[in-house]
A protein has these predicted regions:
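Residues forming anionic-ligand binding surfaces in small-molecule and nucleic-acid pockets
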Residues: 142-151
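Surface-exposed strand-loop-strand hairpins of Gram-negative outer-membrane beta-barrel proteins
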Residues: 72-86
Length: 393
């Protein structure tokens, strides 16, 4: 049980944060995006960019492993286990972001509950290992063979995996927020293929794709049906309709898989979920998805597609045009931390020259601690921002 002093400290941070939310600078940043809807996890993204002042938006996002170093080395085990620390850290993180960077990040009057990319996997029985310095991860895959899919049971909205902790956080954070900030209940964001990879194990699943595709279809079917039912229960619990679909799929990468595998084993399930959800708000893979772009372009009402460092933004611009916005993410080491001024400038100019539809934002993301020289790394990020502000924002 936390003391009144600790709760008052959190509420003091809330007051400072709300000043940022209602600031003129934040209002100006809102104009840089077509719509800023609720984002039920960390790292808000998936927004369609606008160009109100002749410049497209850019965003800087440090990884949580780096943010913790800027908040007195917060122990992330505590952050993921204690709702008060969860609130305090994310508020302090936002205050630090506003102070450090002049990017087009938008602050909203909302708080999230987010335990990392393993959240959904825990619902299916994967055991989580927590770590002090970075996001938690899972132990071994729970499926030693595809025959075990028949024995899986759909996640219980209240009891499975991290759900009891999510409900605890939701209750406590709402009590502390006291109506000043809206606490968002999590939504499912991992794509079905991502889930399948980690429930079965990446090497085994890729072998299954070749020798037992029907078994893979059964696993995908189970995951999709489970996600649909979980989302229905979320609607009953919160009284809120789900937002448009988010599909995080870092495991979709070429040449790990080819276009035919995506077309046959993955796309049909993404399309099914998209039709139920009224479209796809955001499709994400950090892998090389250039070969999949023509098929991804056929997903209904796709608003934003992530274009990571290994995907051709030139091809993405040509394929999506003005229909779907691109979120172009730079390589955090090659394009920022280890880049010199000329390389930073050249990269941004290359994006501008090769994306004539001007339907994109630029994101410096996944910035993690690099060695012991933290000040030097932060200085390089600031240097990149100064250059980025000449072209964007």
């Amino acid at each position: 049980m936390k003391t009144n002093r600790q709760i008052n400290r959190i509420r003091g941070l809330m007051d400072k944060y709300l000043e940022i939310v209602h600031s003129d600078r934040n209002k100006q940043n809102l104009k840089m995006w077509k719509e800023v809807g609720s984002w039920n996890r960390d790292k808000p993204r998936g927004f369609v960019p606008l160009k109100p002042n002749g410049h497209l938006p850019y965003v800087i996002e440090l990884d949580i492993s780096l943010w913790r170093k800027l908040t007195n080395d917060t122990n992330l085990v505590e952050y993921y286990s204690d709702p008060y620390t969860h609130m305090e850290f994310q508020l302090q993180r936002s205050l630090n972001h506003h102070q450090l960077y002049k990017d087009n990040f938008v602050f909203t009057d909302e708080l999230y509950i987010w335990f990392g990319v393993i959240t959904e996997l825990s619902l299916f029985g994967s055991e989580v290992v927590w770590q002090e310095h970075k996001e938690g991860w899972i132990k071994e895959p729970i499926l030693s063979s595809l025959e075990q899919v028949e024995k899986l049971t759909p996640p219980d909205f209240y009891k499975s995996g991290l759900m009891p902790k999510i409900h605890e956080f939701y209750q406590v954070m709402n009590e502390v927020a006291d109506g000043k900030l809206k606490v968002l209940f999590p939504e499912l964001a991992r794509g079905p293929f991502c889930m399948a990879v980690h429930l079965r194990g990446i090497s085994d699943l890729f072998c299954d794709v070749l020798v037992n595709p029907e078994g893979v279809h059964k696993l995908m079917r189970f995951i999709v049906d489970s996600e649909i039912e979980w989302t229905k229960e979320r609607t009953r619990f919160t009284g809120e309709e789900p937002t448009r679909l988010k599909l995080f799929n870092d495991e979709i990468d070429c040449p790990s898989i080819g276009p035919q595998i995506y077309n046959d084993l993955i796309f049909p399930y993404e399309e099914e979920l998209a039709k139920i959800s009224g479209g796809v708000r955001y499709w994400h893979s950090c892998g090389n998805i250039s070969a999949f772009l023509p098929k991804i372009n056929k997903l209904p009402n796709l608003e934003v597609c992530h274009v990571g460092p290994w995907t051709s933004y030139e091809e993405a611009d040509a394929i999506f045009g003005s229909k779907t916005a691109l979120e172009i993410c730079l390589h955090p080491v090659n394009d920022i931390v280890m880049a010199d001024t000329g390389q930073m400038r050249s990269k941004l100019e290359d994006i501008i020259n090769k994306c004539p539809h001007e339907n994109y934002s630029v994101r410096a993301d996944a910035l993690m601690p690099q060695g012991d020289d933290l000040e030097s790394q932060l200085s390089k990020i600031k240097e990149w921002e100064e250059i980025a502000r000449e072209y964007f924002g």
